[in-house]
């Protein structure tokens, strides 16, 4: 779909199978280390509900907990467990890529290295463009506009790490719906107790 994508380009697409095709796209983000084909049943349920459905491959070999849990003295301060915005910054780079601006905020964490090409957003955009080029009858042209994903037409969902990325997208954009399965955000310690990371309480577009 894009020659600049370095790995994990094995996506899954399922057309709508129900009697009523919705004008929405269901996008599923797998968890850490999971393969797109492992969630075929979830795509099937979405398809029978009338959604065209995609299980999107991305750089899910990067784990947020590991990248934000560095305890070595040479670690960047923003990659250590006591830095509250590490998860937000790491997830934004995985979703949008480094050196990217979203909602006037830079997406460039020193804890990970995910290019714009390898980002979730670019992978989804290039997949939609490729599918529409190869099979125009699928009717996917309404889910992107030029070089931009039409997030307002997308139900974004994910499991574990993928659920957290879905949460970031729903924070930054108005999406059709958002579903977090077994995690929407991580936790930080406060007075010896785990509480949701700060970004979970920030104003949201969705």
Predicted regions: what is each one?
Residues 10-19, 176-206:
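The feature captures the conserved acid-bearing segment of alpha/beta-hydrolase catalytic domains
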Residues 155-166:
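Gly/Ala-rich beta-loop-alpha elbow adjacent to hydrolase catalytic centers
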Residues 168-177:
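Conserved hydrolase catalytic core segment
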């Amino acid at each position: 779909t894009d020659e600049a994508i370095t790995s994990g380009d094995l996506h899954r697409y399922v057309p709508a199978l129900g009697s009523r095709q919705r004008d929405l796209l269901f996008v599923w983000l797998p968890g850490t280390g999971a393969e797109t084909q492992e969630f075929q049943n979830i795509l099937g349920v979405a398809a029978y509900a009338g959604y065209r459905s995609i299980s999107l491959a991305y750089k899910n070999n990067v784990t947020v907990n590991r990248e934000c849990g560095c305890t070595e003295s040479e670690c960047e301060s923003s990659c250590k467990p006591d830095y509250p915005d590490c998860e937000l910054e790491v997830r934004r780079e995985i979703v949008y890529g480094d050196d990217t601006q979203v909602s006037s905020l830079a997406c460039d964490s020193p804890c990970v290295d995910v290019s714009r090409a390898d980002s979730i957003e670019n992978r989804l955009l290039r997949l939609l463009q490729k599918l529409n080029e190869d099979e125009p009858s699928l009717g996917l042209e309404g889910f992107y506009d030029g070089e931009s994903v039409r997030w307002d037409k997308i139900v974004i969902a994910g499991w574990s790490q993928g659920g957290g990325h879905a949460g970031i997208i729903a924070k930054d954009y108005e999406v059709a719906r958002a579903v977090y399965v077994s995690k929407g955000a991580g936790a930080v310690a406060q007075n010896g107790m785990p509480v949701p990371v700060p970004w979970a309480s920030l104003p949201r577009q969705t």
